[in-house]
Amino acid sequence: MLLIRELNSVEAAAVSMNTIQEYAEGSRLGVPVLVSMDSVHGLSYVSGATVTGHNLALAATRDEDLVTRLAEIARDEHIAIGVRMTLSPEADIASEPRWGRVMETFGEDPDLVTKMVTAQVVAFQNGRDGLNTGAIVACMKHFPGAGPQMEGKDTSPIISSAETLQIHLKPYYAALEVNIASIMPYYSVPLELDMENSAIGSKATLQDLLRDEMGFEGIIQTDWGMIWAIQEGRGTMMGEEVSDEEAILIGITESRVDGIGGESIRLIDQMEELTNAGKIDEDILTAAATRIVKAKFELGVFENPYCDVEYAVQFVGNEEHQAVNLEAARKAMTLLKNDGILPLKQNEKQTILVCGPRAGDMDSLVGGWSSAQEGLTIADAVAAYAGENATVIYESDNVESIAELAKDADIIIVSVGEPSYQHDPPWGYDTLEITGSQQEILEAAKASGKPMVTVVTGGRPYILTWCDENTNAILEAYYPGSQGGIAIAETLFGLNNPTGKTPLQFPRDMDSVRNQEGDVSFDLENPLYDYGWGLSYGE
């Protein structure tokens, strides 16, 4: 299996896939490649494709049918460019708000996560009965649950009891009922399961729990670069610290891993040597190869591994797909506060100051795990929707300029939030508060005495207590996707009535975050906005 990332056009993507398959066809056995993509929110690594909001935004819609439609679009766009495996859906339950990958989850409610993830699996795999020629392989992650992290820091899972573990396994049990084809283990293993081994070498996790107890017969696929990561981090395998590849390879085969992400070609000669020396059981390797080849046959890639480049160019990211994407972004908009200032009037003779670095940044709408995408930023969209009688001014991050411009503004829209990222959040794990220059921008705008609207983008539940006490309205947009700028502007000007509901609790302060249990949902003390909060116009 091969992982592809960051392709700058649909045509380049389709041509690349065909080139890969041509190379494979000319190899000794001519076995086609099963190409995967780390596409956790649409065909996100292809510029010009349908790049949806992250799952946290989709969770705010509470719309299972809409999530299904978006997953079907993603499936068909993957197939159109020749990619037949997605490293999603994300089944983690966001019980620790500091975790950097909260944005990829459907929030902290195990029931909502289970419902939405199951809908994605069925859509990706074109039905409930396993793979077929109209499917892509869904690789569900990160088993057995990566949402609980010690102080939010990746690779430190803290599931504390057998009862809590069962809660975090709930989406996996549901996915097994609809024949999920592939599952990816997490980097580390919760101590409740295994105190000695890295995830990909944990027999207790993968063989005893996933295979034997839960009955999973599909592909266990490691994340990319995990063998290297274990070597560099002096991880543990089979209860001993190891850095040599031999011990790691023996350990992962004994734990019944099928696919080694990103390192199979580099390690194939060593795998053969270890097998010939009797250190790796050939029957285990045969079983792993059988699972992967079986999936390729079920998908039909042996019969036709190639894609139609011309069709891909006209199909991927088409207007109909983007219309559904925009519908989802609209439904994700979550109005946290409104003292009556919203909706703003269109075509009003007024000066609107839009400020904050996130307002001019497309990546802050799309979020991580993405290539560069085109679209309207928040500032562009506000200018487009304000009307010809309005004057819209944008200032990114010069606090002195913002303070001066605010004096002549009638309305100030301040955009705050974390910039795009993948694993480690730019604001770190120690705070969820708006800090630094963005807080200075808020205070400069507030000093003008003019009406203020705060627009929040990002992937975690930020502490918005200052904004709640000092601004007139707060619109939470999450990472809404490539159509997010339009959805935000439409909501601000009343063309979209916000109906989104928070998919997790928003903390009031960091003390409540530090005092909560990282593996338990709904346990923040006195949250600023509770789970399920969200206003609409007229309320």
Language-model features: where?
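Glycoside hydrolase catalytic-domain context in secreted enzymes
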Residues: 1-539
